[in-house]
Amino acid sequence: MQAVALPEEICWLLEDTEDFLAEGLQNENLSPGAQDQRAHILRGFQQIKSRYCWDFQPQGGDLGQDGSDDNLSGTHGPPLTSEASFWSDYQDEGIEDILRGAQELDSVIKQGYLEKKSKDHSFFGSEWQKRWCVISRGLFLYYANEKSKQPKGTFLIKGYSVRMAPHLRKDSKKESCFELISQDRRSYEFTASSPAEARDWVDQISFLLKDLSSLTIPFEEEEEEEEEEEKEEEEMYNDVDGFDSPRSGSQCRAMALPEPTEKEEDIYEVLPDDDDLEEDTCGAHRRRVDYADYYQGLWDCHGDQPDELSFQRGDLIRILSKEYNMYGWWVGELNSVIGIVPKDYLTTAFEMEGI
């Protein structure tokens, strides 16, 4: 949806109003009714901005961004078309994540304090502003602090590239800088607490970008294979119909059908019933397998840290613990090796109906 350009005075008024409700009243002792009304108005701000691709900024930008930021183009008007299309794609999955507070997000890949560079800071304001930053479900969200109830800005990571950027600063923190850049969207510059922390942010974002770009590849390959198989079957049936139909002036000939091939392997595994449990040499029943603990890898995953478990697509992994579920990680076992695995890379291996 094309965003409607608002007059500059209205943009700043709406932005100041939203900022006062979100930050100015955050620690005030409000009555329950006032708190509900404050939350209701803030949700209305976010829903309208998302629905109409509005930023309440005369210069465009990302959803709910800082008042000191501006658009890559530096001109007045709505956000770039590509930015609006990105948000319209994400809205199909809902806007719940965009409205959540810093402590309410799930599937968090990386979070922590960073200094974010402002595109157009005020005379008395700092060029670098401290923000609580979170990567979750393909989104990069930044908050005023780790207890904020709504983000000051949000953007989709897909379509960006990330790199270390020591050229952003001239002081002692220059080796701790990194940036996200795109050809048709605004760029984002950050400073971490240390060079090692900055490299970890770059590595995590790079891994996520690689994962997002490869999500459609397996589906496309399987779809092409299915289309080829359907085409071959259709040609075979057409040949059979041609021999069955009567032809004038000719005698029907017997068609030599191909020999039946061996029975194709069933792609589903047959689970044993409780009555089929075998007995060992001592006559005792073997321990019953809990199939609900087994998950299958959706994609290849190469662990970057010693405590991360590496696996390939299709590997059968036994989940030992979901203690770190809130961080998006489980504890799994593969080939007697134990490590943490990203839960978004797994799917249930067995159907539990009738077990």
From Swiss-Prot:
<dbReference type="GO" id="GO:1903039">
    <property type="term" value="P:positive regulation of leukocyte cell-cell adhesion"/>
</dbReference>
<feature type="modified residue" description="Phosphotyrosine; by FYN">
    <location>
        <position position="268"/>
    </location>
</feature>
<dbReference type="GO" id="GO:0005829">
    <property type="term" value="C:cytosol"/>
</dbReference>
<dbReference type="GO" id="GO:0005911">
    <property type="term" value="C:cell-cell junction"/>
</dbReference>
<keyword id="KW-0472">Membrane</keyword>
<dbReference type="GO" id="GO:0002250">
    <property type="term" value="P:adaptive immune response"/>
</dbReference>
<dbReference type="GO" id="GO:0005654">
    <property type="term" value="C:nucleoplasm"/>
</dbReference>
<comment type="function">
    <text>Positively regulates T-cell receptor signaling by enhancing the MAP kinase pathway. Required for optimal conjugation between T-cells and antigen-presenting cells by promoting the clustering of integrin ITGAL on the surface of T-cells. May be involved in high affinity immunoglobulin epsilon receptor signaling in mast cells.</text>
</comment>
<dbReference type="GO" id="GO:0045944">
    <property type="term" value="P:positive regulation of transcription by RNA polymerase II"/>
</dbReference>
<keyword id="KW-0728">SH3 domain</keyword>
<dbReference type="GO" id="GO:0033634">
    <property type="term" value="P:positive regulation of cell-cell adhesion mediated by integrin"/>
</dbReference>
<dbReference type="GO" id="GO:0072659">
    <property type="term" value="P:protein localization to plasma membrane"/>
</dbReference>
<feature type="region of interest" description="Interaction with FYB1">
    <location>
        <begin position="286"/>
        <end position="291"/>
    </location>
</feature>
<keyword id="KW-1064">Adaptive immunity</keyword>
<feature type="domain" description="SH3">
    <location>
        <begin position="290"/>
        <end position="351"/>
    </location>
</feature>
<dbReference type="GO" id="GO:0019901">
    <property type="term" value="F:protein kinase binding"/>
</dbReference>
<dbReference type="InterPro" id="IPR036028">
    <property type="entry name" value="SH3-like_dom_sf"/>
</dbReference>
<dbReference type="GO" id="GO:0044853">
    <property type="term" value="C:plasma membrane raft"/>
</dbReference>
<feature type="region of interest" description="Disordered">
    <location>
        <begin position="64"/>
        <end position="83"/>
    </location>
</feature>
<dbReference type="Pfam" id="PF00169">
    <property type="entry name" value="PH"/>
</dbReference>
<dbReference type="GO" id="GO:0001954">
    <property type="term" value="P:positive regulation of cell-matrix adhesion"/>
</dbReference>
<protein>
    <recommendedName>
        <fullName>Src kinase-associated phosphoprotein 1</fullName>
    </recommendedName>
</protein>
<dbReference type="GO" id="GO:0033625">
    <property type="term" value="P:positive regulation of integrin activation"/>
</dbReference>
<comment type="subunit">
    <text>Homodimer. Interacts with FYN. Interacts with PTPRC. Interacts with GRB2 when phosphorylated on Tyr-268. Interacts with FYB1, which is required for SKAP2 protein stability. Part of a complex consisting of SKAP1, FYB1 and CLNK. Interacts with RASGRP1. Interacts with FYB2.</text>
</comment>
<dbReference type="GO" id="GO:0034116">
    <property type="term" value="P:positive regulation of heterotypic cell-cell adhesion"/>
</dbReference>
<dbReference type="GO" id="GO:0005886">
    <property type="term" value="C:plasma membrane"/>
</dbReference>
<keyword id="KW-1003">Cell membrane</keyword>
<dbReference type="InterPro" id="IPR035765">
    <property type="entry name" value="SKAP1_SH3"/>
</dbReference>
<feature type="modified residue" description="Phosphotyrosine; by FYN">
    <location>
        <position position="291"/>
    </location>
</feature>
<dbReference type="GO" id="GO:0001772">
    <property type="term" value="C:immunological synapse"/>
</dbReference>
<dbReference type="GO" id="GO:0050852">
    <property type="term" value="P:T cell receptor signaling pathway"/>
</dbReference>
<keyword id="KW-0963">Cytoplasm</keyword>
<feature type="region of interest" description="Disordered">
    <location>
        <begin position="219"/>
        <end position="252"/>
    </location>
</feature>
<dbReference type="GO" id="GO:0042169">
    <property type="term" value="F:SH2 domain binding"/>
</dbReference>
<feature type="compositionally biased region" description="Acidic residues">
    <location>
        <begin position="219"/>
        <end position="242"/>
    </location>
</feature>
<dbReference type="InterPro" id="IPR001849">
    <property type="entry name" value="PH_domain"/>
</dbReference>
<dbReference type="GO" id="GO:0045785">
    <property type="term" value="P:positive regulation of cell adhesion"/>
</dbReference>
<keyword id="KW-0391">Immunity</keyword>
<dbReference type="InterPro" id="IPR011993">
    <property type="entry name" value="PH-like_dom_sf"/>
</dbReference>
<feature type="domain" description="PH">
    <location>
        <begin position="107"/>
        <end position="210"/>
    </location>
</feature>
<feature type="modified residue" description="Phosphotyrosine">
    <location>
        <position position="142"/>
    </location>
</feature>
<dbReference type="GO" id="GO:0019903">
    <property type="term" value="F:protein phosphatase binding"/>
</dbReference>
